[in-house]
Amino acid sequence: MTHQTINRVIKTEIFTRLTWLRFIGFEFWMVGFTPFFIGYVVSAKELYSFDLFYGFLIIAILTSSTFILNHICDIELDKKNPRKEFSLLVRGTISLKTSWILFWILQLSCIILSFRFNLEFLYCILGLTVISFVYNMEPFRFKSRPGLDLLSNGLSLGLLIPLAAWSIDQPLIEFPKLFFLSTICYLLALYLSLIHI
């Protein structure tokens, strides 16, 4: 594909919309939805409800805020990575300042929406927020530390997200303990397969 052809593709409206979806981590929403759905169904013993879809909305917003933070923290590395040439930040479609504003809008919206449920749910969401920060930002930046990156994803996907879903209908103290191991193993495998696509 020639450089001229690439430029024509980049300028199309469909491409712009798709890059926005990538920027907010749309394709990773399902990674968060899966453990949330499992935790909710085990707790509430129903396959769908308003609470479930409301929870999905919160997880989607949280995932998007995390991905935007990732783009912000990785901007200098992404500029040197040919695979990131279509990134909105790398191309200058969105500024760093606007990215921070969007991140905080999504992050605060996620926390505010969480008040509809209970304090246990809110604590789980706040825990996920903390992991998002230490995973992406200096001086912690767990994503660049072998072992800590997997631990962060395991705690998020295998522990806090299903706990949040469970807490909508049941107290956290009653969460089935053996559930953790199988969920963590399954979701880490799912996550690792997706990031290598």
Task: Give the positions of each predicted feature.
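Conserved small/polar residues in nucleotide/adenosyl-binding loops
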Residues: 195-197
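Interhelical loop and helix-boundary elements at the membrane-water interface
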Residues: 6-31, 84-100, 134-159
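Membrane-embedded alpha-helical segments that form the functional core of polytopic membrane enzymes
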Residues: 33-38, 42-73, 110, 121-133, ...
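Hydrophobic alpha-helical transmembrane segments in multi-pass integral membrane proteins
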Residues: 160-171
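Multi-pass membrane catalytic core of lipid/isoprenoid biosynthesis enzymes
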Residues: 75-126
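Transmembrane helix-loop junctions in multipass membrane proteins, especially transporters and channels
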Residues: 44-47, 75-76, 115-119, 137-144, ...
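Alpha-helical transmembrane segments of integral membrane proteins
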Residues: 23, 53-54, 97-104, 119, ...
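Juxtamembrane/interfacial segments around transmembrane helices
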Residues: 85-86, 107-115, 150-161, 176-186
